[in-house]
């Protein structure tokens, strides 16, 4: 039976196993999806388990989306650009590949709404693990500016590198097109 995991810390709240196990059972896929709480010092051993094919792949959540990168062999262009990985797989050449599917997920959700983001001003509240991916996607959608508000100034400033100089320091909420 193929084994897949979602890793994070904390991880007890994750509904990913329920969702993935439901669809695997519904589609007669011989696999199991579990959650595992890791600490930073567990990451190298965890990646070894994928390399040794004890685990077929994993989803990555906070706080490991950046922290896992040094243990990977390759990154997709989106993962490289955002320095954020949420999916790990062994590729056909037995290389550990880090993917970022958050970008595509966000883009598809926006496309579903049929809302045009071109030249819109966007306000983001918070700078959590998925925000680099959202900023990257918004820039691809050609927004005019992104305003970010976060509890910690340093984390918000760290995200400036993903903004293509479109992130504003100050803005009035009345000027924002999308919140």
What kind of feature is each model-predicted range?
Residues 2-113:
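Phosphate/diphosphate ligand-binding glycine-rich loop within oxidoreductases
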Residues 158-164:
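Short, aromatic/basic amphipathic alpha-helical patches
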